[in-house]
Design a protein with these regions (language model features):
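The conserved Walker
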Residues: 9
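Conserved lysine of the Walker
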Residues: 13
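Hydrophobic positions on the alpha1 helix immediately C-terminal to the Walker A/P-loop
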Residues: 16, 20
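Conserved nucleotide-sensing/catalytic segment adjacent to the nucleotide-binding pocket
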Residues: 27-33, 39-90
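Short gly/ser/thr-rich secondary-structure transition/capping motifs
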Residues: 87-96, 108-113, 163-166
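ATP-dependent NMP and nucleoside kinases share a basic, alpha-helical "lid"
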Residues: 96-150
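Small-molecule kinase domains that catalyze NTP-dependent phosphoryl transfer to phosphate-bearing small molecules
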Residues: 148-166
Length: 166
C-alpha cells in the first residue's frame, strides 16, 4: 500500500509520516521524503555569494525537484525492488555524493509539498492525505525548523516564506 502525504511547508507532513512509521512499525513501513529529490546546485565552489544566490531559488516550485526520479523510485518499491535514495543537504543547497538504501515494505509512505500535484506520482498512490494547517502556524514551525536544522537566519526564513511559500 502506498500512501501520499502532502501539505504546505511546515504543515506537519514529515511528522505525520513518522507517526505512520511508528504506528505501523519500521519493519513494515518505508518512509520516502520528497525533500531528498531536490536538484543540487551545479557543483561549483560554494562561496558566500553562491550560497546567497541558492537561497533565492524557489524550492517550492516543481522545477526544483526531480519528480521523474522520485516516481521511478516509488514504482521500484511497488515492484518490490530496493532503491538508493539521494541525500540532500539543505545547509549547502546540494545533493551529497552518497545515497541511502530503501527497501520495499508492505506500507510505503511518501511525503512532500508537491507530490499530489504530479500525475505520474499520484497514479502510483493508493491513498492520499492533504495536511491543512493555518499559514501562521506553518510559518512558526518552518522558522523553528529552518533555524535549527538548516542553519537559516530569521531574515532568510521570513523572506523565503513571503516570497515563495505563502
Amino acid at each position: 500500500m502506498i500512501i501520499g502525504i502532502a501539505g504546505g511547508s511546515g504543515s506537519g507532513k514529515t511528522y505525520f509520516g513518522h507517526s505512520f512509521l511508528k504506528y505501523l512499525g519500521a519493519d513494515n513501513t518505508t518512509l520516502l521524503s520528497q525533500d531528498h529529490y531536490y536538484k543540487g546546485h551545479d557543483g561549483s565552489p560554494l562561496t558566500p555569494e553562491k550560497i546567497q544566490a541558492l537561497a533565492q531559488v524557489n524550492y517550492d516550485h516543481p522545477d526544483s525537484l526531480e519528480f521523474k526520479l522520485l516516481a521511478s523510485h516509488i514504482q521500484a518499491l511497488k515492484n518490490k525492488e530496493s532503491i538508493e535514495v539521494p541525500v540532500y543537504d539543505f545547509a549547502t543547497h546540494s545533493r551529497l555524493n552518497k545515497t541511502t538504501a530503501a527497501n520495499h515494505k508492505p506500507f510505503i509512505v511518501v511525503e512532500g509539498i508537491l507530490i499530489l500535484s504530479q500525475p505520474n506520482i499520484l497514479e502510483l498512490l493508493d491513498y492520499s492525505i492533504f495536511v491543512d494547517v493555518p499559514d501562521d502556524k506553518r510559518f512558526q514551525r518552518r522558522l523553528a525548523r529552518d533555524q535549527k536544522e538548516r542553519g537559516r537566519t530569521v531574515d532568510s526564513v521570513v523572506e523565503q516564506f513571503n516570497k515563495t511559500v505563502n
